[in-house]
Curated annotation (Swiss-Prot):
Family listed: Belongs to the ATPase alpha/beta chains family.
Domain of life, per lineage: Bacteria
Gene Ontology cellular component annotations, sorted alphabetically: plasma membrane; proton-transporting ATP synthase complex
Topology in membrane: Peripheral membrane protein
Protein name: ATP synthase subunit alpha
Binding site for ATP: 172-179
Compartment(s) of residence: Cell inner membrane
EC number: 7.1.2.2
PANTHER family in UniProt: ATP SYNTHASE SUBUNIT ALPHA, MITOCHONDRIAL (PTHR48082:SF2)
Catalytic activity: ATP + H2O + 4 H(+)(in) = ADP + phosphate + 5 H(+)(out)
Keywords on record: ATP synthesis, ATP-binding, Cell inner membrane, Cell membrane, CF(1), Hydrogen ion transport, Ion transport, Membrane, Nucleotide-binding, Translocase, Transport
UniProt cross-references to HAMAP family, sorted A to Z: ATP_synth_alpha_bact
Length: 527
């Protein structure tokens, strides 16, 4: 049985089907690899490539554009060089190098592109695109540093106080405890996290051994610090480009918390290795070299990175107008946030006048200088008080600490001077002997074991004893025992009327009387 096929029906069906067809044409701008060597590729054909743009090869390896020349583009590889060959095709992503940031990153170990390294699977949750390179907030979007960032270290919080939004350099030879100061500071933020006012921490490991990074992560996990910490790792085995971009990734993550009205702390460990990796990349890209073969813009590299640390103005309508704000954050900006930076620099044989150390000293708001001799003598943290300084943190120090420890720095500097002279003279007048005795006991009080940060109220109480000579009758070798017994007694008998009052930044006659009575009572056991 044959059916009559009407032409009009066929044409209607064809018309309907043709109307539903979507013809999407994606145009990719592609180039060809001319040359590849030591982590750098030269590419022909990418006429419209932008500086810092992300490029992608067919095998998934990424590169970032760093040189724009007349007939080719120089890019740094973010993967193994041996996987890229001459003649490979590479395409533009039309995206500036960036990292996706969000709350779900907390507790994770990532690379500078935001890829997880801890084997715990992909990072989920809501993520925001943050550019690695970004202009620092302008002057009108900032406010002076006025809130303390407690490190939990008596020597730092008393003599070289750090404020939220400050950049404080930690500088010293290898194996002098630079990383320990940073890790102790991160661990000390646990109390803020538990109190509901967290300081989110980003630890950036640049050019370190993988085993060292793993050990640091284990330590942070052991002390419960990974709950509010992100570790960005570019180890010694990673390409130089990844080591160069790692601090920028850390800054971008910190800016996410800062711009959403929260507080963040970023540790760059260390910028000496970043400078070396930038020198390596620049020389292979044939950029002109300057002093110590570093490129001419090495100062600008560190200044533009560290200027991103800031205390943002507490006016939301002004903060929302911030310069160079990423699209992803528009509508989510809040005022009053801060990003504090603790860059670390390694010196050679204590030479702080070398090129990179002097650059970073001049950029930052102060430095904590660690001394090898002090470290070997057992004075840890091995801070050389004479040349360590905090240029803005004093404004952020709590009033009680300022009142108690105001003269400690100069007292300790004078003690070190007198101690050096006393080695040459046999007899000393009573005043000098008393100054040296007090200085020795204060120096012993400032010694603190690793991973045992102390709350600020306990610091004030014990330093009050040292500065006001309440340890006069305590033998030098019993100072640690006195400290432990004194703080235990204070916590048992005077938690509400002394420690809780000191925590608010207040010190009055009732508080000092209770401290003096407790110290006298405990000192009797050791005199």
């Amino acid at each position: 049985m044959s059916e009559n096929i009407r032409v009009s029906e066929v044409s209607d069906i064809l018309r309907q089907q043709l109307e539903g067809i979507e013809t999407k044409v994606q145009l990719d701008e592609i180039g060809t690899v001319l040359q590849v060597s030591d982590g750098v590729v030269r590419i022909y054909g990418l006429r419209n490539a932008e500086a810092n743009e992300l490029l992608e090869f067919d095998n998934g390896i990424k590169a970032i554009v760093m040189n724009l020349e007349e007939d080719n583009v120089g890019a740094v590889l973010l993967g193994p060089t041996d996987k890229i060959k001459e003649g490979f095709t590479v395409k533009r992503t039309k995206r500036i190098a960036s990292i996706r940031v969000g709350e779900s990153m907390l507790g994770r170990v990532i690379d500078p592109l935001g890829e997880p390294l801890d084997g715990k699977g992909l990072i989920g949750g809501e993520l925001y695109e943050m550019p690695l390179e970004r202009k620092a907030p302008g002057v009108i979007y900032r406010q002076p540093v006025n809130q303390p960032l407690q490190t939990g270290l008596k020597a730092v919080d008393a003599m070289i106080p750090i404020g939220r939004g400050q950049r404080e350099l930690i500088i010293g030879d290898r194996q002098t405890g630079k990383t320990s100061i940073a890790i102790d500071t991160i661990i000390n933020q646990r109390s803020n996290y538990e109190a509901g006012d967290p300081v989110y921490c980003i630890y950036v490991a640049i050019g370190q051994k993988g085993s060292t990074v793993a050990s640091i992560v284990n330590t942070l996990r052991q002390y419960g610090a990974m709950d509010y910490t992100i570790v960005v790792a570019a180890t010694a085995g990673d390409p130089a480009a990844l080591q160069y971009f790692a601090p920028f990734a850390g800054a971008a993550i910190g800016e996410y918390f800062r711009d959403t009205g929260r507080h963040a702390l970023v540790v760059y460990d260390d910028l000496s290795k970043q400078a070396v990796s930038y020198r390596e990349v620049s020389l292979i890209l044939r950029r002109p070299s300057g002093r110590e073969a570093y490129p001419g813009d090495i100062f600008y590299l560190h200044s533009r990175l560290l200027e991103r640390a800031a205390k943002i103005i507490n006016q939301e309508e002004v903060a929302r107008e911030m310069n160079d704000l990423p699209e992803s954050l528009k509508g989510k900006v809040k005022g009053g946030g801060s990003l504090t930076a603790l860059p670390i620099i390694e010196t050679q044989a204590g030479d702080v006048s070398a090129y990179i150390p002097t650059n970073v000293i001049s950029i930052t708001d102060g430095q904590i200088f660690l001394d090898t001799d002090l470290f070997n003598q057992g004075n840890r943290p091995a801070i050389n008080v004479g040349i360590s300084v905090s240029r803005v943190g004093g404004n952020a120090q709590i009033k009680a600490m300022k009142k108690v420890a105001g003269t400690l720095k100069i007292d300790q500097a004078q003690y070190r001077e007198l101690e050096a002279f006393s080695k040459f003279s046999g007899d000393m007048d009573p005043v000098t002997a008393l100054t040296i005795d007090k200085g020795q006991k204060n120096a012993r009080l400032l010694v603190q074991p690793q991973y045992s940060p102390m709350p600020v109220e306990k610091q004030i109480a014990i330093l009050y004893c040292g500065i006001h000579g309440l340890l006069r009758n305590v033998p030098l070798d019993k100072v640690e025992d006195f400290e432990a017994a004194f703080l235990n007694t204070l916590a048992l008998d005077h938690q509400a009327d002394v420690l809780d009052v000191l925590k608010t930044g207040v010190i009055n006659d009732e508080v000092t009387k209770a401290i003096e009575e407790t110290a006298a009572m405990v000192a009797k056991q050791y005199s």
